[in-house]
Amino acid sequence: MVLGQPINIIKWIEENGDLLKPPVNNFCLHRGGFTIMIVGGPNERSDYHINQTPEYFYQFKGTMCLKVVDDGEFKDIFINEGDSFLLPPNVPHNPCRYENTIGIVVEQDRPAGVNDKVRWYCQKCQTVIHEVEFYLTDLGTQIKEAIVKFDADLDARTCKNCGTVNSSRRD
């Protein structure tokens, strides 16, 4: 086995910060059993990701807001600079990152047959308006692809309950 070299996170961010682009703003730094991502802000997401494995958040710079749906109730969890947070499996969550913020997120590779979901709730009445399910193999591209498709689909963005046309971008 050939081992990789340690990565100096501060230096990496200085040299590669331009790689953190909307709508997700992530870059997969390490892969293999786990994916370790550097995630910058601001991001432009209104989706809620549902992962059947836990997710670990470490806030390297600034504060982020992790919007979650906990037992049917919408809540905000603020993760401040220097804080870490372990999100349990199957919690719908929307990571809201602000300008000049940087976090590190660790996700377990998905076991065979275990799918992720990306879900959108109506921004007015909170009804589920759209959901896609897929086997996640690439955190760097697949969630972004789902967001781009949702953004282009007026029918998917229109709430059948109240008629609101929702944005794929966070207001």
Swiss-Prot record:
Coiled coil: none annotated. GO terms for biological process: 'de novo' NAD biosynthetic process from L-tryptophan; anthranilate metabolic process; L-tryptophan catabolic process; quinolinate biosynthetic process; quinolinate metabolic process. O2 binds at R45. InterPro entries: 3hydroanth_dOase (IPR010329), RmlC-like_jellyroll (IPR014710), RmlC_Cupin_sf (IPR011051). One of its GO terms (cellular component) is cytoplasm. Keywords: Cytoplasm, Dioxygenase, Iron, Metal-binding, Oxidoreductase, Pyridine nucleotide biosynthesis. It is an enzyme of class 1 (oxidoreductase). Its EC number is 1.13.11.6. GO terms for molecular function: 3-hydroxyanthranilate 3,4-dioxygenase activity; ferrous iron binding. It catalyses: 3-hydroxyanthranilate + O2 = (2Z,4Z)-2-amino-3-carboxymuconate 6-semialdehyde. Fe cation binds at H49, E55, H93. A divalent metal cation binds at C122, C125, C159, C162. Its cofactor is Fe(2+). The keyword Cytoplasm applies. The keyword Iron applies. Pathway: Cofactor biosynthesis; NAD(+) biosynthesis; quinolinate from L-kynurenine: step 3/3. It is found in: Cytoplasm. Its main location: cytoplasm. PANTHER family: 3-HYDROXYANTHRANILATE 3,4-DIOXYGENASE (PTHR15497:SF1). Belongs to the 3-HAO family. HAMAP family: 3_HAO. NCBIfam families: anthran_nbaC. This is 3-hydroxyanthranilate 3,4-dioxygenase. The gene is BNA1.
